[in-house]
Design a protein with these regions (language model features):
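Conserved nucleotide-cofactor-binding alpha/beta core module
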Residues: 1-103, 111
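SAM/dcSAM-binding transferase cores
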Residues: 96-188
Length: 188
C-alpha cells in the first residue's frame, strides 16, 4: 500500500477514535514512507507503523481493518482476523495493469457470528494493493462489474459452494452474494 498525507491523517484520526487504550496498526510497503509515518505519528502511543506489504499482512485480531489500496480480492487472513462485529473496509478495483490506479467500489464487510454481511458503499478510484492483486481475480471482478447490480450484494460467503445465480462475484476463498440473513444453512 502506498502512504500519503491522507493515510497518515486516517491513522491519526482512527487513533483518536480508539483512544489511548486502543491500538492502531498502520502498514506501509515503502520503507521511506513507513519511516516517515513512524516519525510523524510517534506522539500517538497507541499507533504502530509496520513496513510490509499490506496485501500479505495478517493481523492477529481486529475490531476494524481499513485497506487504503485497491485489491482484486479479499485475503483469508483479513477475514480470519476480524473479531465478532468486526468491520473490514476494502476498495475492490480492476486495473489495466497491476501498477496503475484501479476503479471499482468500496466494500464494507461486517463479521456477525458465523456470517459476514457485505455491501458496497460507493465507487472508488485508488492506488493498487500490490500483494492482493492477480490477473485472474482482476478479470473475475471486471466481469462482475460489467454485469452491474453491485448494489444487490448483501453478504460474503466463505463456505465452499458451486457458483449460482446468487453469486455476484464467486472466488476461491469467498463469494460476494445477493443472499441476506443467515446463510450458514444455504444448500450448495
Amino acid at each position: 500500500m502506498r502512504s500519503s498525507a491522507y493515510v497518515l491523517l486516517a491513522v491519526a484520526i482512527i487513533a483518536e477514535v480508539v483512544g489511548p487504550t486502543g491500538h492502531v496498526i498502520g502498514v506501509e510497503i515503502d520503507h521511506d514512507l513507513a519511516s516517515r509515518a513512524r516519525h510523524n505519528l510517534a506522539y500517538l502511543d497507541q499507533v504502530e507503523v509496520l513496513q510490509t506489504d499490506g496485501g500479505n499482512y495478517n493481523p492477529q485480531s481486529a475490531d476494524a481493518i481499513f485497506i487504503n489500496a485497491g485489491a482484486t480480492h479479499l485475503r483469508a487472513g483479513w477475514l480470519d482476523s476480524l473479531l465478532d462485529n468486526g468491520r473490514l473496509l476494502l476498495p475492490l478495483t480492476v486495473a489495466t495493469d497491476p501498477n496503475t490506479h484501479g476503479m471499482g467500489f468500496m466494500l464494507k464487510v461486517r463479521h456477525e457470528g458465523q456470517r459476514y454481511a457485505a455491501h458496497f458503499l460507493s465507487p472508488v478510484m485508488i492506488c493498487p494493493c500490490i500483494g492482493s492483486r492477480d490477473e485472474e481475480s482482476n478479470q473475475r471482478l471486471r466481469d462482475a462489474m460489467k454485469r452491474g447490480a453491485w448494489g444487490s450484494v448483501q453478504s460474503l460467503r466463505r463456505e465452499s459452494h458451486e457458483p449460482s445465480d446468487t453469486c455476484w462475484l464467486h472466488g476461491d476463498i469467498f463469494c460476494l452474494s445477493t443472499l441476506a440473513g443467515d446463510i450458514s444453512s444455504v444448500p450448495d
